[in-house]
């Protein structure tokens, strides 16, 4: 075991100078309280994600235009009961109430048994006693274990009488201590004490071969919360919060399953939680392969994976929940040959997602599946004011996953099989007077089905003057024709077979390709990026339904501290006048929905702070775009308009989720502007280039500078998301960083630049002298121009200027999300145990032969600032825009060579012994271990099964 004290001294070696110089080491410094806690600057609301004067806050987006996004756990389709606060519950669940307060100087924990009991520490009674509040179901003395039965507390939680756990609230740097929830969570906050040799895993309920609450030898039973247990699993969920003000647990499996519970009908399948018919325990690895989840992430079926929200410096953390939910996330238990995954309809003898002889199957996102997987996604948020864990695979899969019925049938919810778009007229008169337009038709899942291209002619509701979006019918992710040969696709984007070996830039590229499919990336970048708008028509309406919904917004408002102006806007546009109608304070559902019923539009400025699935989408895209990808959500009542015509300074991707909305797009008055416009009047617009109605599942792209306005129709509301990218990411921004460097260094080297100005220069130059064309004036102008020509940037100056832009990305980026197969290879899956004497043991240890790599391609940036070598990183960023100062540490040159080697080796792994020498092998090992412990590195082979 390595010497931890010695490692601390190694950190001090390259951090000490920064400490003494008052440099920022890690993003623990906040801006002033007025900016960090509550920023009412309207620049934030009008230019989401843009620079603010003064303290910055993450808005999650950039533009003043219609932007947005969302995601949350849903409710049961049939019978959602509500408590006194209007919170939805499934009658089968043992849920709790949570008050999730964000930006709150004081945490107000809600009332569940765990929370109330954790407010006052429990005093465990005699040996074997049960937790306070556990209901007694036996004549056995209190807390004593019956031979066969585990008792439950009032919340339906299972307890083993061998446990005598206490609840602790471990809050550091907290203005008030808010207790965390049940024993499993609390034990994950503080290291668990392992018992004698042979004892059950940390937090495991049972040491018997029969799972807790299981009724017979072959059945996987559920506890009172509906949690599924297999005797081969000892999985639990942990919320690892450091410096946390309040942690609120997410609700149980039944609730999340009610989001998208699917009961499989066909022979051989079983619904979630059904009895097992296979000899392979749930989550146990099959003999041959690792599988992938719906995001293309590879999992080993031997994992008992859960979702984790790892928040550091977080005012709130919402842990994800139990087995049924985790299994509904991505766990697929394949029974006998021919069985299908949860919710999927089988049309082949080959297991769903299993590779056939020639083909790898993909989900709707183009992700590869294997029948042995049990994967989930994790969101690792640090320095977050709040983390809202997203829900299971069924939800993520619903981003694009469609359950295909019998062979030849159309996808569930598919519609609009006509070649005429909704709202478009095909009258003969309109055909004679308009120009045909080709728009892209997306397959139901934007990836799996063969794409089609249809030609439409604009009708009464789609006036068009020029061709927009002429698109070929090609395989998603590829291009055809002369570029590739007859019928041969190029640039096919396929996921890596192993998640921990994926290149995050390629993952982002593949994600974008799925959004714009069947248009190819080559066509998009060549013909439309920064050039012209286009529309993708889907053949199904549920393409983005898992990201946001009416119910999700209501739940988000209840469970999170969402404030007007900072997080949400109420707007209207009537008689050519745009108004913002924000009250003060927190935005609770009654207030928000009252404005909506009066015809106002609702804009959520930073939904990715609360909605994990939307955040996962943005995180993947930011790796490809190398800049923050933000999101806004817009909810507009029928026959309403919330915003005046305007243009934005971002590249916009509009995802229509619910209802329909009519968009009018106008040619730009200025190409690629650097700033957004103000509100424009209708008289400034002219004729629209595009006049279309977006339906659920449709996508619309338009570059920055293109004027747009949108209005709902009489018979429908509208809910849409706008993803925004590439704000302030131009050559002009690079030159603004570069030229000051050039001038500063040229002054040091050029005497003429340091000479004083002529005494008569004021009498010869300036606006008042512009009309005078005297000889002396011309000599002065020529001399100044000659000096400017000497300001030629060097390669080193260009590199340093680019690094300054990269630091901006490190500061703004969302923290990474971690997959289960990555979890067991990173610090986020590490655990510690302590014996009865308090001696702590770690479950990991790096060695010279350990192979490591960066967690993500853009996770770090090496820079030289004022002669000091620094490494910036974004693993500890918050979920709100620039909530903390940039995270970095200072390095010696030999430290820098190690990081540089890892950057160039990515995505490949490098053994520690093959990294550049650094004094001695022990110093190098400790430095690499220090990087791993900050979440920057990942090992190739897990230390243990997590």
From Swiss-Prot:
Its EC number is 1.14.11.-, 1.14.11.27. Residues 606-742 form the JmjC domain. The modification Phosphothreonine is found at residue 309. Its main location: nucleus. It comes from the Eukaryota. Residues 117-128, 187-198, 257-268, 328-338, 398-408 have a biased composition (Basic and acidic residues). One of its GO terms (biological process) is negative regulation of DNA-templated transcription. Its cofactor is Fe(2+). It is found in: Nucleus. One of its GO terms (molecular function) is histone H3K36me/H3K36me2 demethylase activity. Disulfide bonds: none annotated. The modification Phosphoserine is found at residue 339. The keyword Metal-binding applies. Residues 14-435 are annotated as: Disordered. Fe cation binds at residues 646, 648, 708. Binds 1 Fe(2+) ion per subunit. Pfam families: JmjC_2, RIOX1_C_WH. Residues 59-73 have a biased composition (Low complexity). Residues 17-28, 37-46, 99-110, 169-186, 239-256, 309-327, 379-397, 416-433 have a biased composition (Polar residues). It catalyses: N(6),N(6)-dimethyl-L-lysyl(36)-[histone H3] + 2 2-oxoglutarate + 2 O2 = L-lysyl(36)-[histone H3] + 2 formaldehyde + 2 succinate + 2 CO2. Oxygenase that can act as both a histone lysine demethylase and a ribosomal histidine hydroxylase. Specifically demethylates 'Lys-4' (H3K4me) and 'Lys-36' (H3K36me) of histone H3, thereby playing a central role in histone code. Belongs to the ROX family. NO66 subfamily. This is Bifunctional lysine-specific demethylase and histidyl-hydroxylase NO66. It comes from Drosophila pseudoobscura pseudoobscura.
